[in-house]
């Protein structure tokens, strides 16, 4: 059933992308929950989907499109006060999905890319370009390095902007940098489970980890491990599903999100 699993170049690429996305999303997700910006993460995912659709239409790498539009969305949200960000995120979410629908229509009708909608919105790890794994790993390492450099002031600003400002932290700049890192995280998640489901990989492991520990550093490490376990478990189950329904593979994104949900339910049950 699992013959040739680790020997497959496609599987290796999927494991690399999924693991990189999950590690960064787990860490960023804890900050996102602490800052109360889960909705902003969802909005950036939908905005980035229009970038992915545009990339398909132009025949360039979807990862570049996802990150480009996600970055613009993050910079746009960064200009707003956190209290006003939900309103801006809601408008951005609707606009992003509308643009995605239009661009996917052109991608299908003009370029004949029939599977573009499924790939952009729900992900297709096994169809990722061969070099995408290296780019995903590099992006995740860059994001984690930036988080390590900004950890203390960013954590303080996430818990209390007023206290962080009194301590001399540049709260506005930290907010913008956080949204840039969030855009990068959403980009990698969208490559794994698609734009619509990327919030599950961003918020699910983080919420689970925060149920099990209240120490931020421990929660980030746990969220990264949980996310990677869900991503790799999802890839393994999708690979195994080929023998369940011969000739057809179940979506990787389904198994990843199912693992995320199961881990959260188990954590909630254990905490009573």
For each predicted feature, which ranges?
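Loop-to-transmembrane alpha-helix initiation sites
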Residues: 14-17, 61-68, 86-90, 137, ...
């Amino acid at each position: 059933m699992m013959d040739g699993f680790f020997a497959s170049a496609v599987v290796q690429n999927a494991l690399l992308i999924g693991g990189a996305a999950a590690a960064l999303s787990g860490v960023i997700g804890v900050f996102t929950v602490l800052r109360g910006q889960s909705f902003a993460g969802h909005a950036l995912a939908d905005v980035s989907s229009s970038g992915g659709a545009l990339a398909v239409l132009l025949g360039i790498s979807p990862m570049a499109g996802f990150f480009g539009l996600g970055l613009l969305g993050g910079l746009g949200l960064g200009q707003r006060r956190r209290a006003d960000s939900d309103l801006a995120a809601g408008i951005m979410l609707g606009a992003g999905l509308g643009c995605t629908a239009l661009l996917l229509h052109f991608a299908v009708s003009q370029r004949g890319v029939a599977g573009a909608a499924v790939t952009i919105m729900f992900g297709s790890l096994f169809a990722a370009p061969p070099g995408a794994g290296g780019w995903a790993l590099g992006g995740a390492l860059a994001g984690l390095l930036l988080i390590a450099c900004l950890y203390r002031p960013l954590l303080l600003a996430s818990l209390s902007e007023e206290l962080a400002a009194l301590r001399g932290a540049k709260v506005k700049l930290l907010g913008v940098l956080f949204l840039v890192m969030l855009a990068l995280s959403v980009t990698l998640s969208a490559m794994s489970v698609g734009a619509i489901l990327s919030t599950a990989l961003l918020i699910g492991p983080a919420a689970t980890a925060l149920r099990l520990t209240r120490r931020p550093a421990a929660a980030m490490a746990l969220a990264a491990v949980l996310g990677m376990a869900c991503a790799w478990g999802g890839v393994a189950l999708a690979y195994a599903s080929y023998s369940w329904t011969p000739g057809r593979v179940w979506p990787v994104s389904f198994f990843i999100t199912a693992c995320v949900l199961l881990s959260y339910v188990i954590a909630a049950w254990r905490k009573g």
